[in-house]
Amino acid sequence: MIMKSQQNRIEVSDQTLVVLRAPQRIWSKLYQYQRVCVQWLWELDQQRVGGILGDEMGLGKTVQVIAFLASLSFSGRQLAQGSRGSKLGPTLIVCPTTVMHQWVREFHHWWPILRVSILHDSGSYSGTSASSLIRSTCANNGVLITRSDH
């Protein structure tokens, strides 16, 4: 249950206080409906359930997902060791081949701190085995982008 929503801070109340902090440089550029989406994604994460994000093309689904992942990354960096709370773990994004490189560009634009790799013949793992790339991405809590089409 969301208790309080400030400009770039979402506090969730359950048995313990868990806080998601969105980076100001991202949060300040989001439209209100995109902020609501980030809050919704946070609620799903806290409930340990999935969801489907869908709307018209061009309304910023990619940016909303990146804002959420950046917030998990940002919050995780600020968590004191041993405290409870969410942080970003390894992330898999499955999308059409035609937009994989667009995802990478958007990550580099919005939150370049994250390590982002493409697992595809045209991607960033040339010269490295796919299993090596997957292990490296998991070890570094990075983002792996792969295709959904065959």
Name each region found by the language model.
Residues 2-150:
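ASCE P-loop NTPase motor core, strongest for the SF2 helicase catalytic module
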